[in-house]
């Protein structure tokens, strides 16, 4: 897997990879990450992939991160509570 672009963003670390005839967009926020795969034949090139990172898309991504964080925190609390019962 090869890094082809690191996209500057004030909140997220956004990296675009090229691998196996696909572009992979990896968006990281703290300890969570989301990945999106796009077949390289479905886009004209890297500029088109980067253009997909609209404000609307990134707001949706942020909302998903919030939900992921809640889910993970709940799972952690549940596990900790179960350990204390033993």
Please name every model-derived segment.
Residues 4-7, 43, 49, 66:
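Extended aliphatic helical segments
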Residues 48-86:
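Acidic, low-complexity intrinsically disordered segments
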């Amino acid at each position: 897997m090869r890094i082809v672009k690191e996209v500057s963003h004030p909140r997220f670390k956004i990296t675009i990879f090229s691998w196996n005839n696909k572009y992979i967009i990896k968006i990281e926020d703290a300890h969570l990450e989301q990945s999106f795969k796009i077949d390289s034949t479905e886009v004209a090139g890297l500029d088109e992939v980067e253009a997909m990172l609209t404000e609307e898309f990134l707001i949706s991504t942020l909302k998903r991160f919030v939900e992921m964080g809640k889910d993970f925190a709940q799972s952690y609390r549940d596990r900790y509570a179960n350990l204390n019962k033993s």
